[in-house]
Amino acid sequence: MPLTRLAKLFADNLVHTSPQVIADHPGWLFAQRCEAWWKGQLDEDPVSVLLVYRSPRVKDTSRLYRPVSNLILSANKVEYVARGTRFDPTMIHCDKGTEWMVLRMTQADQFPKDPIDMSEVAKLLSVAVDGALNETIGKGRMAAA
């Protein structure tokens, strides 16, 4: 599962539940989430981490996307951690770039204090997401920045 592979990048700092698949529509949409805590902050409320990988044909208002949008809309706070596009011939309209994003969400008024710089997390994810998706669900390559 791609979220498990991505979480391993932060194994020294992060504890997480097993990822749960939210949507799995091959060629269209894949989404999974897990609950996560920074090590040393296990008494804090968990943060939900959401990975979304979707065809450019899947819009925010699409019926297929509803389980994902419901999760996002039900959170008190949402933050994009990293996002980008890649070309994946297994996805519908891949020539336009398949979107991926990693978000974190919480019901608390604020996110727990981060022990590592979130801009560094974003950089690591931006590099690692291609391999994580290739080895699990997609066979694409990163789009040029």
Swiss-Prot record:
InterPro entries: GP70. Pfam families: GP70. It comes from the Viruses. This is Gene 70 protein. The lineage of its organism: Viruses, Duplodnaviria, Heunggongvirae, Uroviricota, Caudoviricetes.
